[in-house]
Structure formats: C-alpha cells, structure tokens
C-alpha cells in the first residue's frame, strides 16, 4: 500500500507517479473499518454544524452518501452517518477526531485524512466551496496546520505540471498540428484548445489527457485516475480551472454592459491554486495608491490572486475629491466628537460645520456616481462567477470602501439565483458603505460557505459625513457591527488600526492581519511571485501629512505615522468616540470650492428629495439617482 509522507512546508514535493499496474487506493481505505466509520462520522457531524440550513440538505446528503461509498463502508452505516449530518446524536466531532488520531497511520501522519478528503472532494473535477470549508474544518479538528492543506492542494497541481513536462514529442507535434489547423488564436492567450472532440487542459499551457490522469493517480488513486482519463473525466477536470485554466485573466469585458465602462481582472500573483482570491479596491488615490493593486501587495490568501479593475476614471475622481477635502481640513481650528450610544452604535448627535457643508458637493457628486456604479459592477461580477468563468473552484472576495460595496451587491445578486451555492468561500468587507441591518445580510448565508467578515471603524468620520443625511436612522456596516446571528458572521472592530477612511488602503497589511487573512512577511523583498508590472512605482504623496501619531497594532508593533485621515488635536479616551472636523477657515473653503468638478451632475432622486450621497435601493436598479427615503 502506498503511504503519504508530509513534505517540508517550504518545499512541497509531489509524490512519484504510480506505476500502471499499481492498484493504488485512496488513503482513507487503508484505515481500519472502525476508523473509517469515525472518519465518515466526523465529516457528517461537521456538516451538521457548518451547514444546518434546509437549503444545504441536498449537498450534505450527496456528500455523505458519496463518502460512504468512497471509504468502502457498508451501506448499513449510511443511515447512522446521515443522522449525524442531520444534527442528531449526542456525540461530538472531537470524540471522532480523537478516535482517528489513535490510528497507527494517522498517529504519525494526521494530514492523511485531509489529503483523502481533498481527493474525494476533487474526484469529479469540481471543488465546491462548501467542501473546502469542510476540509479546512476537519483539518483544524485533527490539529493539522492549515499550511499543510495548502501544500496538499499545491501537490495536486504539481502532479499536473509534471505531466506536462513529460509530454512526448509525438503528442506535442500532434497537438500543435491540431492547433494550427483549427486556428485557435486565443489559445496563446488563455491556454486552452478544444479540437476534434478532445480537450487539452490549460493549467499552465497544454496538457495531454493521458498524462494528466497519470499525474493525478498519485493523489486520488488509480480508480479515480481511470475516471479522469476518460473523455468525460477530462472535460470535468478542465472545468475545475475555468476558461482554459487561465482563471480570470482570460476575461475582459468585450463591450459596455449597461452603465459599466471598465471591468477586467488583473493578476496579483503568478501561480495556480485550487482556490482563488479576488481583491477589489474602493478608490484610486495619488502616488503609490494610483493603481488598483497597490493596497493588496501583501495579500497572501492564495497562490492565485486577482485584482478587479473597474471604472478607473470615476474612482480617480473620487480619490482626488477625498484627498482634496482632507488636505483642506489640515487648516481646521477645532474639532468635536461624534457620540455613539453604547448599545446600538447609532449616531446620537452630530453638528457638521457650515463651512464643510458648503463644499460638500466636492465629495458628494463623485461619491454618488461611484455608489451607483459599484452596485452595477457588483451585479456584473455576480453573473461572471455564476457562469463559472473562474472554473469550479472556491472564490474569496476581499474589498474595502466601495470595493466592499461591489461585494455586497455581488452577493445580493447571486442570492437571487438557484445555483448560487458552493461558489463563494469567504468574503471580507472593510469600511463598507452599505446597509448594516441584519435582514439585508440574511440571504448571504445561502451564498457564502465560510466566513462573512465585516470590518468597521467607529471613528470613520468621513464615512459618517457622506451618510450624514441618513446615518441617524440607518445602520452603516462600515461604522458598526452587523448583528446577524449566524456562525459565518464575524464583526471586527478596526478602530485601533484605522484612524480614518483613507487608512483602509494605507493600512491594509495591518488590517488583513487583524481580520485573520494571511499576509506575506517582507513581501517587498521575498513575497509571493508577483505578476509582471504589479508593483507600483514609488511617488511622493501629494497630500499633506497632518499627524505624526503612530498606530500601535495588536501585536505591539509600530505601524508608522498616521495618515491625513487622522485629523485630530485631541484623542477621545473612549473607543466609542470618533473624530470629526468642526470648522474650516475661509482659505480652506475657497480651495475646496474651486476643486475640480465631477464628471456627472448633481444627482436628484425621482422621489423628489434633495441630493444625497446614500444610494437608494429603489433607484439603483435603473438610474444613477440617490434618495434619503430608505426602507
């Protein structure tokens, strides 16, 4: 029997390909019958904890039924395992985990169960996000570091890469003749060609089908490899990596879709992974923050990461407006705090200076335009993910400010479709300018398999200002917790890290650490393999630095000087107080009034109410108007 040796964390080693006559079987079947039962019971009980919703019952039933067959357990145990998956029985998952760890095979190699469960989840060429959440959960219960699961996933891909290198000269010549005959010009760009009923998998280019199956045999066993070697099996394998294995880099909006003018994916890293991450920027600033990928250079959630480039023209105008108004506030003469109630976090009283309100259109106009466009971009992203452009792999979405709003409307749109499950693994919304009432987040439980993270800052006065006409009666997610009662929902108070709205871009490295997203230490020198041209050029910031206070992170490290968002002369002792400007001098008002005018005019809602930076749900579906009349 073949055994699995854990490779060194820094240098994953792919196992040797199995011989053709080797009757290799999955590792799970090498366990004793009692431990195979404990293995299935552990998964069943975990499913009941992770996905208790009625909408998930069909997935749990199908998964458990297939796992029992995969482990060659008697059909008589299926009702018992199904009872565990339904939440019945008093046994806990920890009991089954401890039983498994006593097995001789798992005592020295506890990751064997994770490897086998990963193999089972991938046997059909589909990697459901719910399956990965389960694999991660079981891996944690068995006290296996998550880095080892990443290695297992990488080894699976390495077997495919090795198969490509072993492609014979005859097979290569035949493939090239077919490519030339069919004139698949896009093959050079997206790495996939389908010719004469045969399929070439494009993980890193073209892979011969028999060799792909040979490489996968070492991971899923000879029986699974035989299935993958068939025409149907290779087709499903191709679907795992999306459009020819090129992920989302092969997608670019061919024509304008509705109000959207720009929408494309930029690679943040060079690499392939069984799960991908999409980062979404909220605005474009000056200096090193003028590019979409600048805030995400330390992100290390996956080896395959993308940045969504959308509506650069309007995001640049918004960024200029933000920096203009904040630069003018450097001359303010006094400040006062926004007071929040202890229980609800809703603004109790606020008095905005007349000088600031008089130049509010500097930010209101571009903000209102971007509010509408972010909603449309989110809906378009939803349809791309639903069409599996990224392949049948789990997707994690991370965004700040208007980028978080894109994610919000993406989830909202996906929740309306029946096939929305099993696509999204985790979502992270930071400083989200969206509705924070739990009833609006409830449908996301059916879309997101893993975590729904809401990162908020109680002291974000700029976000409060753009919501000034409605924030008294509206719960803004970027200012307070979202009180959704679900195991997925996680609220993270970033007040100690984020001094103002612009810090979401400038302190992203620290923010990602606080919310539990992996970052690469020393990423500038030895980080992830960055895509060519993804690292922005350093340029001096054009905006004034008005505070030299240092932010002390949770790990005790100093995070440099605070940004111009931290405009304060006094610091409130309570975390429930936020800084806001109380007055501007005449020169400041004049400089703000003469700022560049936004591209689109002042937006008036059809309901007849005055201009408002808050997007009205009744208006975002067909117009670019805003309204204070919110449900």
From Swiss-Prot:
Its main location: membrane. Residues 568-594 have a biased composition (Polar residues). It is found in: Membrane. InterPro entries: AB_hydrolase_fold, DUF726. Pfam families: DUF726 (PF05277). Residues 156-183 form a coiled coil. Residues 1-27, 555-595 are annotated as: Disordered. The chain crosses the membrane at residues 200-220, 228-248, 343-363. It is a multi-pass membrane protein. GO terms for cellular component: membrane. Belongs to the TMCO4 family. This is Transmembrane and coiled-coil domain-containing protein 4.
């Amino acid at each position: 029997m073949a055994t699995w040796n854990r490779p060194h964390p820094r240098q994953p080693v792919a196992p040797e390909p199995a011989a053709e006559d080797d009757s290799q079987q999955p590792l799970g079947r090498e366990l004793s019958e009692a431990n195979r039962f404990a293995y299935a019971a552990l998964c069943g009980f975990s499913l009941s904890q992770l996905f208790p919703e009625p909408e998930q019952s069909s997935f749990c039933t199908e998964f458990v039924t297939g796992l029992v067959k995969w482990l060659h357990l008697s059909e008589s145990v299926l009702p018992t395992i199904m009872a565990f998956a339904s939440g019945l029985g008093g046994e806990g998952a920890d009991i089954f985990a401890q039983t498994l760890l006593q097995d001789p095979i798992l005592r020295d190699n506890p990751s064997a169960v994770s490897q086998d469960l990963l193999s089972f989840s991938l046997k059909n060429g589909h990697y459901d996000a719910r399956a990965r959440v389960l694999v991660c959960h079981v891996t944690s219960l068995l006290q296996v570091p998550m880095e080892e699961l990443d290695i297992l996933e990488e080894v699976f891909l390495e077997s495919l890469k090795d198969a490509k290198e072993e492609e014979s000269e005859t097979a290569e010549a035949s493939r090239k003749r077919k490519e030339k005959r069919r004139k698949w010009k896009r093959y050079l760009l997206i790495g996939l060609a389908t010719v004469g009923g045969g399929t070439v998998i494009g993980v890193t280019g073209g892979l011969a089908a028999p060799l792909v199956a040979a490489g996968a045999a070492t991971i899923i066993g000879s029986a699974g490899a035989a299935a993958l070697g068939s025409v149907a099996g290779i087709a499903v394998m191709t679907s795992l990596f999306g459009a020819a294995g090129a992920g989302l880099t092969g997608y670019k909006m061919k024509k304008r879709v509705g109000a959207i003018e720009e929408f494309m994916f930029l690679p943040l890293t060079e690499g392939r992974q069984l799960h991908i991450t999409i980062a979404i920027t909220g605005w474009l600033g000056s200096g090193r923050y003028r590019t979409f990928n600048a805030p995400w250079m330390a992100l290390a959630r996956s080896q395959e990461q993308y940045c969504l480039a959308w509506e650069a023209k309007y995001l640049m105008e918004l960024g200029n407006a933000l920096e203009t108004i904040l630069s003018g506030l450097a001359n303010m003469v006094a400040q006062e705090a926004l007071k929040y109630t202890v229980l609800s976090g809703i603004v109790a009283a606020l008095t905005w200076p007349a000088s600031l309100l008089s130049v509010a259109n500097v930010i209101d106009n571009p903000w209102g335009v971007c509010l509408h466009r972010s909603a449309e971009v989110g809906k378009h992203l939803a349809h791309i993910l639903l069409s599996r452009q990224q392949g049948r792999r789990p997707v994690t979405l991370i965004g700040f400010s208007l980028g978080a709003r894109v994610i919000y409307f993406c989830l909202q749109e996906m929740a309306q479709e029946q096939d929305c499950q099993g696509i999204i693994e985790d979502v992270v919304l930071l400083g989200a300018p969206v509705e924070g009432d739990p009833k609006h987040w409830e449908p996301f439980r059916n879309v997101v398999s893993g975590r729904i993270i809401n990162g908020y800052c109680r002291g974000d006065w700029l976000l409060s200002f753009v919501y000034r006409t409605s924030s008294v009666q509206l719960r803004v997610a970027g200012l307070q917790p979202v009180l959704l009662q679900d195991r997925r929902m996680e609220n993270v108070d970033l007040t100690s890290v984020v001094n103002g709205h612009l810090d979401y871009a400038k302190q992203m490295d620290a923010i990602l650490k606080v919310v539990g997203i992996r970052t690469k230490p020393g990423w500038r020198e030895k980080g992830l393999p960055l895509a060519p041209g993804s690292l922005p050029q350093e340029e001096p910031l054009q905006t004034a630095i008005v505070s030299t206070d240092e932010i002390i992170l949770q790990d005790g490290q100093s995070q440099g000087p605070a940004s111009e968002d931290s405009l304060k002369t006094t610091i409130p002792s309570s975390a429930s107080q936020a800084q806001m400007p109380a007055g501007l001098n005449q020169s400041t008002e004049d400089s703000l009034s003469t700022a560049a005018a936004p591209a689109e005019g002042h937006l008036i809602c059809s309901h007849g109410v005055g201009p408002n930076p808050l997007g009205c749900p009744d208006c975002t579906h067909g117009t670019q108007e805003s309204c204070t009349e919110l449900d």
